[in-house]
Amino acid sequence: MEDETELCFRSNKVTRLEMFVCTYGGKISSLACSHMELIKILQIAEPVKALNCNFGHQCLPGYESLIKTPKKTKNMLRRPRKTEGDGTCFNSAIEASILFKDKMYKLKCFPSTGEIQVPGVIFPDFEDGKNIIQQWVDFLQHQPIEKKIQIIEFKTIMINFKFQINPVSPRVIIHLKKFAALLEHIPTPYPIREIKPPLEDSKVSAKFMVSPGKKVRINVFLKGKINILGCNTKESAETIYTFLKDLISVHWQEILCVLPMPD
């Protein structure tokens, strides 16, 4: 088969944009206490499997593996991170392990502000993130807390997306140096603050400044996988996706190459 034929695409030059992980968030009414005070008040019960804080730990029977223990310092030359209490958790937070559809989520709650973070959300409609926050509020409402707890808002904190080029042959790969050069010389939807050239021919990385103080990183891999990382809205990801899709459609003969046939 000739290389020119190998470089012909299917009708869809790239796959659709997919979310693959999100840190979801929200805000609940202030608990009017610190994490140090709250961990002493809380009594472990369903639906929470474990509670971890720098000033206390609890778990239901059978979930002892979810209790965090202090880590040994590996690098004595590195400046140690400032910690509080036993240093096992994020400062100022209480971490709750809550189950949803066979997946364990680790919710972080900052009692003094009411802020909530749920890493590892995988449902495109954020159903799992919303459910975990609701379970946490239900748990708090059955605790000896004087204030009424309610959800004030839901929000996305960080969303990661992915898509893939669609060549007709597994021997078609991206010429990463040429891809990086194109990013430097063609108009982009957002200013590019940094382009990292291919490191050992594995990927090229670039950072888009999507708003003041907010950067979104793309990673373009040799075999055609492309990640859009650190978005706080789906709209910014879709804008970058459309730009990259058009770039690939217009310049595919420049940025794709074909590996030789195996002997």
Swiss-Prot record:
Keywords, ordered alphabetically: Early protein
Induction entry: Expressed in the early phase of the viral replicative cycle.
Domain of life of the organism encoding this protein: Viruses
Domain notes for this protein: Possibly contains a TATA-binding domain.
Family: Belongs to the asfivirus B263R family.
Function: Putative TATA-binding protein.
Protein name per its UniProtKB record: Putative TATA-binding protein pB263R
Organism: African swine fever virus (isolate Tick/South Africa/Pretoriuskop Pr4/1996)
